[in-house]
Amino acid sequence: MNPIHLQARLFLASLVLAGHSSEFRQQSCLHYGPSAVVLEGTLIRRAYPGPPNYASVRQGDEPDTALILSIPKPICVAPDSSSDEGDKQLESGVRELQLAIGTDSLWAQLRAVHSPRLRVTGELFHAISGHHRTRVLIWVIQIRAA
């Protein structure tokens, strides 16, 4: 093979590999609501210390159980640049999201799922209170088995 052709092929191959490696490094972020997202993961029921002291279940605090969606790959969540409303804090490496379930029909959907693997549709929002147990939560619109 001609040395010039070999150099050209090696150069093109290095460009292709460089392009793919930057794709893996640059993770596209999901956005906080009002846009809906769909995430799949495993449901975890985790107890946290609740009232009266929010310090230790072993020392008498009531357990406060949160429903957590554990996703297989970390995501980043960014503000929606087209919206003046909502959360402004960038979060990266998010692997767990607390489920925010606001209606009886959604609770019924959750009870109807007989698998720990879920497919959740909802709007992302940032934690704003002590009752929010993960950095990013999902306001649930729909729950299905994954």
Regions found by a protein language model. Give the residues of each.
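Bacterial N-terminal signal peptides
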Residues: 9-18
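Bacterial N-terminal signal peptides that target proteins for export
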Residues: 2-10
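Mature extracytoplasmic domains of secretory-pathway proteins
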Residues: 62-64, 68-89
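Structural detector for short beta-strands of small beta-barrel domains
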Residues: 34-65, 122
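OB-fold/S1-family single-stranded nucleic acid-binding modules
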Residues: 128-146
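Beta-strand/loop nucleic-acid-binding surfaces
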Residues: 80-109
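Short boundary/loop segments of OB/S1/cold-shock single-stranded nucleic-acid-binding domains
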Residues: 22-34
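Short nucleic-acid-contacting surface segments enriched for D/E, G, S/T with interspersed K/R
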Residues: 105-120
